[in-house]
Amino acid sequence: MPFDRPGLTMRPIEADELPAFGAFIQGVFLSDVHDDEIELDRRLVEPARTLAVFDTSGSGAPISNRSTPVASTAIFSRELTVPGGPIPAAAVTAVAVAPTHRRQGLLAAMMRRQLDELHDTSQEAVAILWASEAAIYGRFGYGAACRANHLDIASRQTRVRSEFGRSGQVTVCPADEAAPFLRAVYEQVRHLRAGHLDRKGPWWDARLFDPQWRRDGASSLRFAVHHVGPPSSSGDAYAVYSVKGTWDATGPQGVVSIREVQASTPAGAVAIWAFLLEMDLVSHVRWDRAATDEPVQYLVDNPRAIRQTSVDSLWVRLVDVDRALAARVYAAPVDVVIEVSDPFCAWNVGRYRLTGDQTGAHCTPTSSDADLAVSVGALGAAYLGGTSLTSLAAAGLVTERRPGALAAASSAFFAARPPSCPEVF
């Protein structure tokens, strides 16, 4: 659908417009712009996959410079792990509208063009995003497919249970020494855990970006690696964290803030969590984006010392239902006809026969009677295997047309572990 708004134009940015693009986004998100962040953006942003709306009317624009956007969005080309392994995903980011131009339909227009182009060019079958506000993206067909737990652990009130034996050694090392271990462990984990993203090119630099202005009085990032043998041996777990020392009248009240913990073995999880919880001078260990099944809650002797707050994290949009459903595997054999409603992307409306198992899947349009009726947003929520179709049906978001079809399909969509996305993009 062409963008036809008097005085406004929508187009991808040019490479030399990136500083203004980045400054605009930071301003909308209530932050200042920093040169080091713009330099990182130069390595991450693909100008051809951006969209910006420019006010050319001379009225209402934030400044006289017409190269400053009034609305923006972009796509990062990433790999998303789904049940069965990684697939290409359009990682939607930088969605912003200037306060001078809100409530004018600019967000909907950008979402429309973005999804139309993905479909028309047969690019990624799946789009993903983190929602700044959870009420925004459902109307564009996104569903909340992952949840994360905010953890606040009173570390003096609990410890890893004594029956969990410890082997190997945890070492704290500089970033350059830790890097190969972090990369190796993460690659093992991300291929197996739905919701994880690849970190090719500059994405490790983005994940470990640690400017002084972000630290809020805490230390620089520190790196702990668990080695299965001596420090020169391979690693199977790591923690990336910062520390902030504070004292009150009773003594030290330091805080460990976790950026990321990954473990490819149970022994690694035991060792790295014991290290974090037993740190001297620390009263709390906090993590904003832990997996909902993070092992620490099962390892400690006093789980009530862990305060957990569950929040939505990764949202999934099936751009092309047939291609997306065929791109993952299924935990149990499935043969079901799904009737899909999609008010925003009419090409998805219809019935599809999905057949598949743990080795692969096929999904094709059909005229057969539907076994299930579901919205594209509900399918997005179920896509990574963390939200069951039966739970969505209990909320009225899935309708069973053939008895038994719901239970069978729900079992097939299931993932052995809930999906987790450890990084915001």
Features from the language model and the residues they span:
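Conserved active-site alpha-helix within GNAT-family acetyltransferase domains
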Residues: 120-125, 130-151, 292-308
